[in-house]
Amino acid sequence: MTEHGIKWGCEYCTYENWPSAIKCTMCRAPRPSGAIITEEPFKNSTPDVGSMERDIGSPLICPDSSARPRVKSSYSMEPSSKWSCQICTYLNWPRAIRCTQCLSQRRTRSPTESPQSSGSGLRSIPSPIDPCEEYNDRNKLNIKGQHWTCSACTYENCAKAKKCVVCDHPTPNNMDAIELANTDEASSIINEQDRARWRGGCSSSNSQRRSPPTSKRDSDMDFQRIELAGAVGSKEEFELDLKKLKQIKNRMRKTDWLFLNACVGIVEGDLSAVESYKTSGGDIARQLSADEVRLLNRPSAFDVGYTLVHLSIRFQRQDMLAILLTEVSQHAAKCIPAMVCPELTEQIRREIAASVHQRKGDFACYFLTDLVTFTLPADIEDLPPTVQEKLFDEVLDRDVQKELEEESPIINWSLELGTRLDSRLYALWNRTAGDCLLDSVLQATWGIYDKDSVLRKALHDSLHDCSHWFYSRWKEWESWYSQSFGLHFSLREEQWQEDWAFILSLASQPGASLEQTHIFVLAHILRRPIIVYGVKYYKSFRGETLGYTRFQGVYLPLLWEQSFCWKSPIALGYTRGHFSALVAMENDGFDNRGAGANLNTDDDITVTFLPLVDSERKLLHIHFLSAQELGNEDQQEKLLREWMDCCVTEGGVLVAMQKSSRRRNHPLVTQMVEKWLDGYRQIRPCTALSDGEEDEDDEDE
């Protein structure tokens, strides 16, 4: 027999290994299980063929031996003795209980079927199952369970390998637990059967063929069990980690998620996430816990004890740091009517949803059926000054009020309107996210937020169903606006369509910022004009001018018939990417209102005069006018008078009259405001009593 015939070839790398090797020298792949050794490999003298034939029926190497076969018998090499897998048709060795390729269970053979014998001159194999061959199959099954297949190059690696030895692909985390369980179960069954057969087989065998001491076998099997237990243990640890993370997530509340989103937003530069957490009433000084750091799973960015301020300093977010430090220094809990009365607020939201209808016809735009205008109650003036200050701190946005009044004379710049005509405007506080425009519109009408995105849905559906109408107005207006600034250019229709598709997409995304076109559509949904008082320039947090805002002006529902719309407008304020509702306070209605103010002698009606000119007495722009509607200032003033109840005050200011009535207002809104105001009335007596006592003491002195 030649040397090439004695060696066995590896089925993975084809390397020729020595017969005593149990693994491939090159790739460490296990030796394929086949026939058993039929001669003593360590004899000094070479046996003849006759002795081989005499000893073929009684193998010399028992299950406890670590040696591997040298010469394969004719029985094991006969192809017809193999069984075909019913799943993948692979030919497996007769002793295999599972398919080598797909690990599917061997089909149970019927009593009529019998394996074909080779019919050669060799003696037939005895009917009892050979413990050595049984051991080979079991060993192969264990080895199969100790390996994992690389998903990139399909190479089988050892279980303890962290990455593929061929392509360095990492070990997959999702190990097949079913395969490991089946392998372990099958191995335990074979072990029990093997031990029972080994007791019977070894008792009747010759003393010269007795196996070596079992310490070698036990050590090998212990090593295999350790490898398999390590693989199972690592999977158990992975499952425990997943279970722990799931428990942490189940304990998380909405505020916790907003806090984590704010932390990630600082790292990634997302200001909206920080503002969402801030407006929800979250604690700016909150620190990251160990569970939260584990859930974020970014040790390089997050650490236990970090706050939003720490993260802003670490990642050099100067703009976010300015907002956070301002919030820490001026932290005041907000208390608006919608927060105090959640039950009434939900009923109002249902009323709004029920009042949304779609107009039949060519212009199938959605609209609201009710005319509601929110005003602050006049009873606030009856509260003590300290209580009034507390109320205004909790319901108003002081930063917006200061920017619109002091930094730029945008609102309340006329003493005539603010004092004598009681038309002072107040900026209500709302969420500083992308929904601020929709929130401010509902606050100016119903006094609540667009929490359920009812108004956003109506906005998106109106833009989608009436896309042709709004698209024509938008395209014509954008072209004229660019030319008015001396920008003479033309866009392809594909570019116009892309920009319009972006505007449509913003309307469908909750939290997305909205543009001038969306205000124009909202004016049609409300069926009333919208006046926006805003800053003229975009500015950075350092005060640097970045560009024009283009939001200030009047938005008329030009695509409706005038008879279908109301002439009482609402007012919004715009400051640095944020919209706020501008509302007035109720008045008694019997003061001298100036020239042109007709109150119909109804004391219950509150009239607020909204200026249609800026502080320089220039007429506000009317957005989205067509070429036929564009004209000089007199023509635009005429158009404003057609769509709104306008008058000129004694000071010569052109104003639009916003009329509201507590008696005609929606009863749910009235109940909500009264319940909110009762909370401040309850703290009035103590303060009033102490002030009265001090006044009496002063008089006595």
From Swiss-Prot:
Binding positions (Zn(2+) 2): 85, 88, 99, 102
EC number(s) from the headed UniProt entry: 3.4.19.12
Role summary: Ubiquitin thioesterase, which specifically hydrolyzes 'Lys-29'-linked and 'Lys-33'-linked diubiquitin. Also cleaves 'Lys-63'-linked chains, but with 40-fold less efficiency compared to 'Lys-29'-linked ones. Positive regulator of the Wnt signaling pathway that deubiquitinates apc protein, a negative regulator of Wnt-mediated transcription. Acts as a regulator of autophagy by mediating deubiquitination of pik3c3/vps34, thereby promoting autophagosome maturation. Plays a role in the regulation of cell morphology and cytoskeletal organization.
Chief location category: cytoplasm
Family: Belongs to the peptidase C64 family.
Record-level GO cellular component terms: cytoplasm; nucleus
Name of the encoding gene: zranb1-a
OTU domain ranges (all copies): 425-585
Protein name according to UniProt: Ubiquitin thioesterase zranb1-A
Disordered as annotated region, ranges: 108-129, 198-219
Residues bound to Zn(2+) 3: 150, 153, 164, 167
